[in-house]
Amino acid sequence: MDIDRREFLRLGATATAATAAAGIAPPLLRAVPEMRPEVPGMEIEEATIAELQAAMAAGRLSAVRLTRTYEHRIEALDRNGPSLNSILQVNPDAGSIARGLDRERRAGQVRGPLHGIPVLLKDNIDTADQMMTTAGSLALVGPAPAQDATVAANLRAAGAIILGKTNMSEWANFRSFHSSSGWSGRGGQCRNPYYLDRNPCGSSSGSGIASSANLTAGSVGTETDGSIVCPASICGIVGIKPTVGLTSRAGVVPISHSQDTIGPHARTVADAATLLGGMASKDPDPRDPATNDNRDKVYSDYTQFLDPTGLSGARIGVARKGVTGYSEETDGVLESAIHSIQNAGATVVDPADIPTIDQINQGAEEITVLVYEFKRDLNAYLASRSGVPIATLAEAIAFNLDHKDSELKWFGQEWFEFAESDPYSEADYNTALAEERRIGGPDGIDAALAKDNLDALIAPTGSPAWPTDLVNGDHFTGASSSPAAIAGYPVINVPAGMAFGLPVGISFMGTAFGEPKLIKLASGFEAATKARVKPKFVPSLPLDGSVRRRDRDGDEDRLSSGPSLALRHI
């Protein structure tokens, strides 16, 4: 079964016109509940982690009160009201953990900037507590894992409160050719917080929604190709996709050890940087060989690189070929971003194309690597779980067939079946892995940076949110995540503007372990633009025939039910 990139794009289509039938509430049947003031003299909504810490240091706020405030918002906005459906579980131990952290603070023992800060984790990140880890699938419903994922353990050690687990695209969007971003058999369909009939992207859907809707101070997602940065773009927040190996993947339901990485979602670059420092593995993790090298390039404090004037004197390249031209509206946000970057004192080189982008967009190497690694990596992970219904990919396939009314009611499991069939030899895999590393890294992003002595590349992260449509699938035109994904390089999405009331983000791309430079640039862009707009949970976004998109060749077509091609985000 040969699949080229264009087919890969087409097969990545899914979403939700039939949300009620998916087991979630119908669109906004009553007004959004009024948020009662939980903290006298302080507005929790949009508060930064630094502001929350200052309030706790001054005695105006406690970890217990902050946790209760977010729990109240979850009940009002996620379970009721707009029913965002972004959270699968709230940690029953969150309150007691918060009380313990408040006692530490009163004793003068503050662990750091995350002390007492509630954080949500994507449901594919193991926690050894009273919460399950299921990757959104009923096939993993059962006892909690025996051990925390390393990122969860690191966050706990930093003083963060694991508030709960977020809904996600089931199995991180690597089950079906036709899955809907933000849908899982366990949780149903997530909703975009800006317009509830729009898709939140995925696979870290709930993490993006919850941070945008102020249900948490920040959240943690995972990415193989686009799953942190796409929900960040579409949900109007910051997302950092770190270099592979900066954060440990131990205890995370895998797709690909060559591309998987764990990173933060937050409303500001500063908050995302704070979370990244708490998550990062400064020492090698024996459970993840990718953390063995480059520890001198990993920091416990990434906020030191924040700089509101970070664009001044920088050289920024605009990657256009293969990652722009999908819609007038998205391109308009890009042009505005370029203008802001220039006004902030940067030199812009336009275009600064990735020379290997055509081969990257064909996707043959990436597909080979992901399909080959998925079966092996997933089976190895499942061997660590006990008391759940499945122990292998083959058993997951059989489970879904036995529970097709709940798991296969909207789409199938073609990626599962394809991976289980072992279509690629070890030689095929080794060749593809070496080639994707080359075209993504040295001959791709690195070559583009070196050609014009650039500090970073920018590109639109993706187009605005499409209508959720479980029957026909995701409708997005394209994205810029793949070069960094296959190289294992970092990307930061920052809100850049709005199109039809929907957020559009810009990605800053750099070389391996280039997070310090990207954080400096991203914080400068954020300070120059202040583009984030708080969501208002509007029921639907009606569009008329004036909305148009451009195909790759520049011709224009009228947009009806959505773009004909969709780049999968996994």
Report the location of each language-model feature:
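Short, surface-exposed loop/helix-turn segments at secondary-structure junctions
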Residues: D452, P464-S482
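Short helix-loop capping/hinge segments that flank enzyme active sites or metal/cofactor-binding pockets
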Residues: G116-A135, Q304-A319, T368-D443, P495-P503
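Flexible glycine/proline-enriched surface loops and loop-helix/loop-strand junctions
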Residues: T134-S137, R191, S203, V253-T261, ...
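Structural helix-boundary/capping segments
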Residues: A76, I161, S212-R320, T324, ...
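Gly/Ser-rich catalytic/binding loops embedded in alpha/beta enzyme cores
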Residues: V32-D225, T243, R267-A270, G441, ...
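An N-terminal boundary/leader segment
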Residues: M1-I97, R106, R320, S336-A346, ...
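Acyltransferase
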Residues: T67-R68, A149, D301, E328-D353, ...
